[in-house]
């Protein structure tokens, strides 16, 4: 069952790849503007905890920032230090990787980061606990985006690998 009132437009979304110190400063300036909610995602070289983080992405409904956290650490640290509420799909995976990436005694702990993070995977289970094979939407990010955002949204993961 489609719920059109939940569908959000993605027209006008601007994605900023951080490729220079000026880009990193722009990302930090964006973080300082103050936001009600910031989505965060990590891309790793594997699915286990010891996989290396190759990209960190964060943003809102209009602006996204994508960066290699090994080259541009300051915006990622600023995100961790900010008090803005975060949202992530399968948040423990992303938050654990962020905490490991920013391993330093003065940085927020996993508990601190999780306390201000909403996990959309948990929300998806609350909305419909059924898996796709059982007649539900499923709980994967692509299936949820197709249902609630845009059924024609491209599979960016597939496109990145193509």
Regions of interest found by a model, annotated:
Residues 40-46, 90:
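Ser/Thr-glycine-rich phosphate-binding loops at phosphate-binding pockets of nucleotides
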Residues 31, 47-49, 111:
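Sterically constrained small-residue positions within well-ordered secondary structures
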Residues 1-42:
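N-terminal accessory regions of nucleic-acid-interacting proteins
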Residues 2-19, 51-162:
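Active-site-proximal helix-loop-helix substrate-binding element of RNase H-like nuclease domains
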């Amino acid at each position: 069952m489609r719920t059109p009132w939940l569908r959000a437009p993605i027209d006008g979304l601007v994605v900023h790849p951080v490729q220079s110190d000026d880009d990193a400063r722009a990302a930090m300036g964006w973080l300082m503007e103050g936001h009600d909610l910031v989505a965060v995602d990590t891309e790793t070289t594997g699915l286990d905890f010891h996989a290396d983080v190759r990209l960190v992405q964060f943003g809102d409904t209009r602006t996204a920032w994508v960066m290699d956290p090994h080259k541009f650490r300051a915006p990622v640290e600023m995100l961790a230090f900010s008090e803005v509420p975060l949202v992530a799909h399968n948040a423990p995976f992303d938050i654990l990787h962020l905490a490991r990436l920013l391993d330093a005694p003065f940085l927020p702990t996993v508990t601190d980061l999780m306390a201000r993070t909403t996990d959309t995977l948990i929300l998806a289970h609350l909305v419909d606990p059924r898996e796709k094979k059982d007649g539900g939407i499923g709980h994967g990010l692509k299936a949820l985006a197709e249902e609630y955002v845009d059924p024609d949204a491209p599979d960016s993961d597939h496109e990145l690998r193509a």
